[in-house]
């Protein structure tokens, strides 16, 4: 947390979300934030299933005696039995088919001769836990705005087509736009009126093609 007015942990939001029928939750933040509030997640029965690291093209460092921070954590939490939680594993189209040659083994290791085989694993592969994608630096409408290309696969993973996603801190509306682009409905909550107006204007423009969405996660 910093001294910035919008950089605050809002007490009670985990309880409010837990009171709904929501079973999946993606949460962005620093490791420090998650450690400081671990008991609050546990008290509201949110269990962590996995973590994603968003590696940005640039970073920031508030301290000269620490490493330069170029990443952000994205943790997935769920409630209830894991078997009943909707999940649609996401893929990226960057697997590469390859041909490998096997060398003949020396006699003392057994009689396995040389050979050649081709693996046909080109095409889609599971989304990696480290996602490299440019931040919105220089283009952002909100200090913590996320790229659509990062949010879209996270939404598709936790919500079936046509379902409603809720962003209780929607900022300029990136998650809401990503939800619409992926065939979902969306509800956003934003306490800062200027950002709420930006989000409303953004969604009213009915953007179906977005330059940010073209950035593939890799």
Task: Kindly give the residue locations of the regions a language model identified.
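Class I S-adenosyl-L-methionine
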Residues: 45-218
């Amino acid at each position: 947390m910093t001294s910035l007015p919008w950089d605050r942990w809002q007490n009670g939001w985990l309880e409010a979300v837990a009171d709904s029928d929501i079973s999946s939750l993606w949460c962005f933040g620093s490791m420090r934030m998650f450690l400081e509030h671990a008991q609050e997640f546990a008290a509201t029965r949110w269990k962590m299933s996995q973590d994603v690291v968003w590696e940005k093209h640039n970073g920031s460092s508030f301290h000269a005696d620490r490493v330069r921070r170029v990443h952000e954590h994205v943790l997935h939490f769920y409630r209830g039995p894991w078997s009943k939680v909707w999940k649609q594993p996401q893929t990226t189209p960057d697997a590469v088919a390859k041909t490998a040659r096997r060398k003949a083994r020396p006699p003392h290791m057994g009689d396995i001769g040389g050979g050649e085989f081709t693996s046909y694993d080109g095409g889609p592969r599971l989304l990696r836990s480290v996602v490299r994608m440019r931040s919105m630096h220089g283009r952002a409408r909100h200090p913590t705005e996320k790229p659509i290309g990062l949010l879209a696969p996270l939404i598709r993973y936790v919500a079936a087509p046509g379902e409603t996603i809720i962003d209780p801190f929607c900022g300029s509306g990136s998650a809401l736009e990503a939800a619409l682009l992926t065939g979902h409905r969306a509800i956003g909550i934003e306490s800062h009126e200027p950002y709420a107006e930006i989000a409303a204007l953004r969604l009213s423009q009915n953007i179906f093609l977005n330059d940010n969405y073209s950035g593939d996660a890799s």
